[in-house]
Amino acid sequence: MDSKAIEIVRNYIVDHLDKSDKMPEFEVYVVWKCKALQNWKYLLSSTLLDGMYYEMTYNGDKKEWYLDAYKKFENRCIPD
């Protein structure tokens, strides 16, 4: 399952890169994953410095993958 999630995200990234730029070298990696019954949930990111992260969900009943792509705008510490 890991390799399929990584492959889907990698293909998504390549499809959305600026075609006028040289293809950068990058890796896609799993940040977090869990399995509930026949379903999988993944959070993934890449070594590109674009602030993107990806959520992959595998529906085991339907044998389908779902991809959500997010842009991180800010990371801030809020003290108690």
Task: Please report, for each region that a protein language model flagged, where it lies by residue.
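Compositionally biased, low-structure terminal segments
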Residues: 13, 27-30, 71-74
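A short, surface-exposed interaction/processing loop segment used at functional sites
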Residues: 62-80
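Generic preference for flexible, low-structure residues
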Residues: 21, 25, 60, 72-74
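Amphipathic, interaction-prone secondary-structure segments
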Residues: 27-64
